[in-house]
A protein has these predicted regions:
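Phosphate/oxyanion-binding active-site loops and adjacent basic polyanion-contact surfaces
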Residues: 55-60, 103
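Short, well-structured alpha-helical segments
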Residues: 36-44, 57, 81-85, 125-133
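An active-site-proximal "capping" alpha-helix that borders the catalytic cofactor pocket
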Residues: 63, 102-118
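Divalent metal-dependent phosphate-bond-processing catalytic cores, especially two-metal-ion Mg2+/Mn2+ enzymes
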Residues: 2-27, 48-54, 66-78, 90, ...
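Amphipathic, well-packed alpha-helical segments that form the structural scaffold of globular domains
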Residues: 44, 64-68, 112
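Activation segment
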Residues: 97-98, 162
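His-Asp-centered metal-binding catalytic motifs of divalent-metal-dependent phosphohydrolases/nucleases
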Residues: 63, 81-97, 107, 129-136
């Protein structure tokens, strides 16, 4: 991505640029255009870092689309939709391929800082931060499950597990590329530890729509990938 404001105005970024501005306008109508764009430039720079192969702008776009789809069918609107969208922007904004990194905590801190600059209502910003932190475990407590935004982002972030076979396989290859420095056997064991818990749960997803429409494909994809890793 071209750095600075030139990249912000490049053709491929038009849709994301417009989406960021719209998401900000829904919760911070009095934010200055300069501040909105400064934060947006920083976010897009992060999402285009060269070490990202899966956790990149394509992932951001896919999760935003999944958030919108789930909000539409589940009747999640207003501030709940806004929280889900903003959390999506920040949920992998900090991404380091390092076992000692605390990406979600650092992303949540970034969200709190940047939303405070707009500014966004503190209670709404706190909800965004909570959703970002949820993505560390890809699971929700009973209390978190009562928040529609947290449920939507939980499922949207896991949409790729249910993707068509070609996209799911591409996702698996992209994650492997991010961890190319890890030996094959060690990676296979660690990756299996990440994926297997989704299969042993009663449900991969939390929303009614995702359970009905995404879950069967997700379980097929997960089982196939775990078998491949075992080979």
């Amino acid at each position: 991505m071209t750095s600075g404001r030139a990249g912000w105005h490049s053709g491929p970024m038009d849709a994301l640029r417009g989406r960021w501005r719209a998401d900000c306008a829904s919760v911070a109508a009095h934010a200055t255009a300069e501040t909105v764009d400064e934060i947006g430039i920083d976010l897009l720079r992060r999402w285009h870092e060269p070490h990202r192969h899966y956790h990149d702008a394509t992932h951001l776009t896919e999760v935003l689309a999944a958030v919108d789809a789930l909000c539409a069918v589940e009747g999640v609107n207003g501030s709940n939709h806004a929280v889900a969208a903003l959390a999506t922007w920040f949920h992998d904004a900090v991404y380091a391929v390092d076992p000692l990194a605390d990406n979600e905590a650092e992303s949540a801190t970034l969200a709190a800082q940047q939303l405070g600059r707009l500014p966004v209502d503190p209670d709404l910003a706190a909800r965004v931060v909570a959703v970002v932190l949820d993505t560390a475990s890809h699971d929700l407590t009973q209390q978190a499950s009562s928040d529609p935004a947290r449920v939507v982002v939980h499922d949207a972030d896991l949409w790729v597990l249910s993707a068509p076979v070609a996209r799911f396989d591409e996702y698996c290859a992209q994650v492997r590329e991010e961890y190319a420095h890890v030996p094959v056997a060690r990676y296979a064991a660690a990756r299996t530890e990440v994926l297997r818990p989704f299969l042993v749960r009663d449900h991969v997803y939390r929303t009614t729509h995702a359970r009905a429409e995404w879950e069967p494909s997700a379980r097929e994809n997960l089982a196939r990938e775990i078998t491949r890793l075992a080979g």
